């Protein structure tokens, strides 16, 4: 066998492995977003990816390995709004409104996944680990947005950042722009 042909076969094999790895990761992400991590079986992931279970295990020896790959891939493709952009806005009211608009837009785009993972985090260590960076992000965001020393103002800001707050407003037919105005007024009155 020529050196060139061997090099090509190795490259093709590496490409095939990477493609299979990605198919498995994306199948798991799809299931996590539709039924949730706790209700996603490895058999269902393998079936959705079009591979056998042993192939799945070769790529992801443990469920934790698969979960870590899913979280990493999902949040790389769906990054949270940029905190530095908020820091750069000098006017506190404008900063808060911009932050809410961006965060609520993020929630609109990612609600099924976030709801499923947050639900499952209550009883799954893997899901809890997956939401830890989101929780840290929200703590940092609140630190940027809380401008008053009043306890109620801080609580109002933290409440406004919660996915559950946005979900409640959306479920009541409140458009994002109106939700931003409403919640901004609530926080200002605290």
Where are these regions (language model features)?
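Alpha-helical DNA-contacting segments of helix-turn-helix folds
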Residues: 32, 65-74, 114
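Hydrophobic alpha-helical connector segments
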Residues: 63, 69, 80-109, 135
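Basic, helix-initiating cap at the start of DNA-binding domains
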Residues: 1-51, 58, 64-65
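Helix-turn-helix DNA-binding motif, specifically the short coil turn and the N-cap/start of the second
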Residues: 52, 175
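Amphipathic alpha-helical packing segments from all-alpha helical-bundle domains
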Residues: 101-118, 123-155, 178-189
